[in-house]
Amino acid sequence: MHYLGIDWATDKHDLCLMADDGSILSQIEITHDMVGFNELNKLLKALPDVKINIERSDGLLVDWLVQQKYDLYITPPHVMAYRRPTRVKDDKGDAFLLAYLLRLKDADCRPYNAQSHTVTHLKQLARTYNRVIVEQRRLCNQLIDNLRRYYPVALTLFTKVNTLISLAFLEQYPTPEQAQSLTYEGVERFLREQHYRYIQQRLDLVYARLQVPMPQASVQAGYVEHVKMLIPLLRMIHHQRQALIKEMNKVFLSHPEADWWLSFPGTKGPLTAALLLAWIGDARTRFPTANALQAYAGTAPVTRRSGKSKSVHFRKACSHPTRRAADNFARQSRRHSGWARAYFQHRLDRGHSPARANRDLANRWMKIIWTLWQRREIYDEIKHVANRSRKGQQVVLAEAV
């Protein structure tokens, strides 16, 4: 058996080919194009048996290796950072370490589990969605910062400053002087022109807040121009986000196991089930145990033992997008599942913070998801509560909202 470690980079890749006895047979560098891939293929075809270890599970090189049906393993970057002897990044050294760990059958070298095309598509959309959220937050923070400097009342008129109604108001009335000149009828007319659904609830409040005397900035022209620049960007990203949500739900519903995911309480909300499928995937062999999924999702704590001492810590090394998806699912489930709501309250009563209590609930859900996933069974709330009662565990103490 031969072992190949590949240190991935943007434009080139360092390779280390190791024999079964640990001797280095070859250390070369290939380019990130078909010329380099063909050079790699020529090297591998000359070997009777070879296993490949690489740091990432996506990208053109990984796709090409999968298409060529090579035996592929993944060692995540955070593991490599921890396992480096000197903690210093070195491409050739990393390629050697990848081959070395694979030769030792290290537990951190995980077999590559190919996902379906639908899950791969959904995961790509989920990454885009996360980046859109980050960009929207960045632009929104700029808008808030500018308004605080010269127009703070605009932050209080609507539920959020980056909603379409708020952006439309700022576009028509970009200065506090223009806003204060509005009559009651003018505010009502604006809301009706924007087809605002909550006119009766918001009209009096908006008008009253505009009548409160406001401090004036000595110079505000620069702030106004910045706000005018941000408005179309935030409006565009709002529409893109909504379109992305529709596309993600469309792709999710095309997956053969969509109904299985939707059987869990709280997953019918926007993207709740879609994000779980995107980040967990549909390769059942990827997580050999429930604990493997819980650790991957970051819901299970890390337990450290030394002699007679034992300490439990928050798990930092995990898939952070999966943790966010699991936390969101746990929050949504409390509104639709009596036992989930009672379990959360029980953790609060034990003195846990809301964040930790919700994470504990997410950890329970990850175990349930893994178990039913392996059994290919639909979630049944009544059956689950009966199982908890039979095992002497806490049963439903509160009705779901």
Feature annotation, model-predicted:
Residues M1-V401:
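A detector of single, family-specific signature residues
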